[in-house]
């Protein structure tokens, strides 16, 4: 653990990253046993004791420059921007302060931004150590702290927020259930928790080298450590985060003797040992995963765990390897995390029957990089000639660079210190098709060649490509490994693997943008290189007077490029035929984020999927509107021109030509006339009947209304006379 108590005169660990920087600032005359000042403290020229003044005055005069520079650097680390992007040391100190009741041996591995779902969402951070899962939230001084021991976890489950958004993890113990949501990279966090949980159940611990390797993969190479951190153990291979000068002497191929397939598969690579290398999932875990991207698919283990979004994982012991590694091999420190997979140890087993001893040695000693395997082809060209074509000022390389539109190409000669270990630097300018950014970018490529012996045909070339003048150029660079294996006199295999290495750990959104653009350019570059090598091979066979069609099928075997992400991306689709490549970007292996389409680009290359979807929706809407307009127009026309259509149809009919046809027409007309007359007769008859009924009704009405008049009396009555 980090020790924050002052210890003056305390020696720095030999593998501490800050010690190397401090030793470079010290003058050569400084004795190694001289006490070093504490970081962050000023060095006084005087002392309370006269004996200390006389004994230290000479040493202080020689290290004044180094002390000032070191103090300036320590003050810089505590500036305002360090609060916005804290280092791993600061995060670990915060972890120790927040969870002071944890054992002293617990060290922070990674932390994620998330929220705890209770009555309200409590936004905070989830801290993972080797044996504990901790959560801390502080909302307006309302603090929430949770500490869960991994051994007490009974169920680990992926969940969905509001049954829709897959960004939550549920952790259950015997007494409680904790629902954590708002993860930016839920699958990565789940996988890491699951593996640590299995380790805790199996009572297995990580070795210091594995632990620090995980920390480096999560936080990058700059951890902010000082000489006070004596428990730091530097991994020999940090996935490109350290150079051979920093991690130690380079292990030459000539110093390693072949001893067998099982032993050779566990030997270190020329740049350094690959022990303690975690799976690509863990290597890409971000400490600020709340900015998450779309994230990538998981490796084979995670794909089995993620059969459904709500899959529940129960503690099941992982099967142990049947063949343990030798105790002195680089894989002897591997714990239950399976940091070095069997697929990465053996690079090629499909052609073991025809491979020579040299190919078997190099394939076992030089595993591919952890990114992607881009070229795995056998060419009917000798290994020496293939090396000259790719790594010398050959006409093939010049023509290929011209096709990629590279300018200002400068190739420095190979260093002649040793034929087994050579080095050179290349500089050139690549075009960029980005309309908003720069139109070109300068590139510096450093190539290091390793060979088993001066007379050996095969070789390995490690290339580091730095692109300048592009966004986030100080965050990443690309690394490539060319492995040329001689199979026969005129037969060689070329394997090219690549990976993206980060100097600083970017946000997940920025990281996804970098990886998407870089991998697009890298894959296009090497696919183009593979096609050009195939053309050169064909030309070479034709010039030799051989039948190209008969020999190419038997002498050259092609393999589908594989993805070397530890099965993180799931099953890979086979690469299309080289002649039907639809995307060509000039950045290629040179890690330019913006690439220019090539001349053989297809008609639909480079179109975003969102634009295609929007175009399809617009076309469907236009078609529906056109159909609706046609139906309305048809109804209106039908309503106004029905009779005219009928008459027009009769007018355009076929006129009779013979007497028989005229007779038929007359008969039809007569029949039609008779039918019409009969109908009119019925109508008239019905009308007459109605009129008769009306007449009868009116007569009855008239009879009912008429009243007979009373008879008139002509004789006078006696009462009518006057008195």
Swiss-Prot record:
Gene3D superfamilies: Pleckstrin-homology domain (PH domain)/Phosphotyrosine-binding domain (PTB) (2.30.29.30)
PROSITE patterns reported in the protein's UniProt record: VAST
Subcellular location: Endoplasmic reticulum membrane; Cell membrane; Cytoplasmic vesicle, Autophagosome
Domain of life of the source: Eukaryota
Full protein name: Protein Aster-A
Domain VASt: 370-541
Its job: Cholesterol transporter that mediates non-vesicular transport of cholesterol from the plasma membrane (PM) to the endoplasmic reticulum (ER). Contains unique domains for binding cholesterol and the PM, thereby serving as a molecular bridge for the transfer of cholesterol from the PM to the ER. Plays a crucial role in cholesterol homeostasis and has the unique ability to localize to the PM based on the level of membrane cholesterol.
Biased composition (Basic and acidic residues): 566-576
Post-translational modification Phosphoserine, affected residues: 265, 269, 273, 418
Disulfide bridges in this chain: none
Broad class of the protein's primary localization: endoplasmic reticulum
Region Disordered, annotated ranges: 1-63, 257-337, 562-601
An annotated Gene Ontology molecular function: cholesterol transfer activity
Species name: Rattus norvegicus (Rat)
Membrane topology field: Single-pass membrane protein
Biased composition range(s): Low complexity: 1-18
Composition bias type Pro residues, residue spans: 28-38
GO CC list: autophagosome; cytoplasmic vesicle; endoplasmic reticulum membrane; endoplasmic reticulum-plasma membrane contact site; organelle membrane contact site; plasma membrane
Swiss-Prot/TrEMBL keywords: Autophagy, Cell membrane, Cytoplasmic vesicle, Endoplasmic reticulum, Lipid transport, Lipid-binding, Membrane, Phosphoprotein, Transmembrane, Transmembrane helix, Transport
A GO biological process held by the record: autophagy
Free-text note on domains in this protein's UniProt record: GRAM domain binds phosphatidylserine in the PM and mediates protein recruitment to endoplasmic reticulum-plasma membrane contact sites (EPCS) in response to excess cholesterol in the PM.
TM annotation in the entry: 610-630
UniProt xrefs under Pfam families: GRAM, VASt
All residue ranges annotated as the GRAM domain in the record: 93-160
